[in-house]
Amino acid sequence: VLLIGGRLMRERGLVAAARIAAATGVRVLCETFPTRQERGAGLPTVDRLAYLAEFAQMQLDGAEHLVVVDTAAPVSFFAYPSKASVLHPDGCIVHEVDLDIDPVDLLEAAAAALGAPDEVPVAAAARPELPTGPLTSETVAQALGALMPENAVVVDEANTSGLFIPGATAGAPRHDWLCLTGGAIGIGIPLATGAAVACPDRQVLCLEADGSAMYTLQA
């Protein structure tokens, strides 16, 4: 398994990781909460490592080697009783690349050394139908995918209500996706405010859970 994060979550890094996957058959996952991810039509898609320990263990089940580039080897966020803290399977060898090495240059060089193809699968342009009926987490996700503007910045602190959003927006016009800082909550509103100040020419969408919003309403 190739686990990526950080600077690899933009176009060049995503393409390089997809090229390596095409050449070797390695499974590519990304960290649970990427700082900034470029997503949408025309870009390679990558599955996130699940937040819940038992689901993350299922994703990593059977892995003999875990190559970690520009992120950290995955551990649980909390010491839940009877739950694993280290998420990779017993016997899996973890290879963590030095963070001082440029991760994009590294993966591009690896792809070239492997003779990896230049063309890789990317998300097709596609939007869900604009929904009707009751307001649910699923219909909110469909509406977001149907209406998302080009070059939007999405701040995602939807938490448990956001399960349907990644699938509904995968083929939307290209956008940036900003996530939480690890297991902490409360960053969504100030992060969206900062994004709007930094990028006044882009539309910013803040997907905010009600409990998380209570921490930073002053933003």
Model-derived features: positions:
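Conserved beta-strand elements of the Class I
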Residues: V1, E64-V67, V153-V155, L205
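Glycine-rich, anion-gripping cofactor-binding loops and their flanking helix/strand elements
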Residues: I4-E96, A172-R202, M214-Q218
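Electropositive phosphate-/nucleotide-binding environments in soluble metabolic enzymes
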Residues: R10-L14, A50, E54-Q57, D100-V104, ...
